[in-house]
Amino acid sequence: MTKDILILAVETSCDETSVSVIKNGRDILSNTVLSQIESHKRFGGVVPEVASRHHVEGITTTINEALVDADVSMEDIDAIAVTEGPGLIGALLIGVNAAKALAFAYDKPLIPVHHIAGHIYANHIEEPLTFPLIALIVSGGHTELVYMKDHLSFEVIGETRDDAVGEAYDKVARTIGLNYPGGPQVDRLAAEGEDTYSFPRVWLDKDSYDFSFSGLKSAVINQLHNQRQKNIPIIEANVATSFQNSVVEVLTFKAIQACKEYSVQRLIVAGGVASNKGLRQSLADQCKVNDIQLTIPSPKLCTDNAAMIGVAGHYLYQQGRFADLALNGHSNIDLEEYSAE
């Protein structure tokens, strides 16, 4: 009988302290998440120093809770996986150093995991990945289209040239007057309004899979500024609908076109913005029309969590891709350089 592989995973790249135990690359035995949203809400966004402080305060308790919830001990664990980047460097270092301490104390292999690879592998938990596939990554810090021909093989075929889609959502939300985190509130409002503004769709060069959201963001900000200057009433739901329609149309079109060009029948979506109901519906509609299998994780697996890191870590474990205790956190890591040879 094949021995079960247990991975203890640690994720601290931004404002969630999360630890998970994953069995055999798919089964979540525990997935403890300590959120910091309330602490950052009064600042209107994540404050790196505050995030780091909360990680320091919560990491030990979160590790213990994950082990208890999984009903395992450190002796049962086969390897420690940890997000090494990209992310907030101070936040990353808390998780990396905690993972290194565990690896040293219990003589376990240490597995560095790319944060975006983790988001991609969140899909594998609910629906096993089949290749080739196109991955649409949409989050607060990243907007990318990635072609994968096999496990841990990443070819970035498109990326944002300026703002990430989640960043644009948060800035538009603040301009409208919505509280942090603004993305989910824009999505909720968008379901209630009408596309009365017809904000621009930014397609960039012909056949390009790159994205740009800074112009759209500026168009929304300028529109609302002009209305306020002229005392013209602002219907928040219409602003949200018009903005979201512009974003979703571009994301959907480019994702579908990439599937067609690369002869791929599987599209997966990853990152916090994958929770967006408008985007999920648009992709579902177009994938159905084009006979493409669509996978989007449950909302709880779209946001940052250690389970996704553990799943990616499992495949790195199988390839023997370990780090020594000199491992450090990195605020920026190229996904393609991280790809398996």
Swiss-Prot record:
It comes from Staphylococcus aureus (strain JH9). One of its GO terms (biological process) is tRNA threonylcarbamoyladenosine modification. Transmembrane segments: none annotated. Belongs to the KAE1 / TsaD family. GO terms for molecular function: iron ion binding; N(6)-L-threonylcarbamoyladenine synthase activity. It is found in: Cytoplasm. One of its GO terms (cellular component) is cytoplasm. It holds the Pfam family TsaD. The gene is tsaD. The keyword tRNA processing applies. Its EC number is 2.3.1.234. Binds 1 Fe(2+) ion per subunit. Fe cation binds at residues 115, 119, 304. Substrate binds at residues 137-141, 170, 183, 187, 276. InterPro entries: ATPase_NBD (IPR043129), Gcp-like_dom (IPR000905), KAE1/TsaD (IPR017861), Peptidase_M22_CS (IPR017860), TsaD (IPR022450). This is tRNA N6-adenosine threonylcarbamoyltransferase. Its main location: cytoplasm. Keywords: Acyltransferase, Cytoplasm, Iron, Metal-binding, Transferase, tRNA processing. Disulfide bonds: none annotated. It catalyses: L-threonylcarbamoyladenylate + adenosine(37) in tRNA = N(6)-L-threonylcarbamoyladenosine(37) in tRNA + AMP + H(+). Required for the formation of a threonylcarbamoyl group on adenosine at position 37 (t(6)A37) in tRNAs that read codons beginning with adenine. Is involved in the transfer of the threonylcarbamoyl moiety of threonylcarbamoyl-AMP (TC-AMP) to the N6 group of A37, together with TsaE and TsaB. TsaD likely plays a direct catalytic role in this reaction. Its cofactor is Fe(2+).
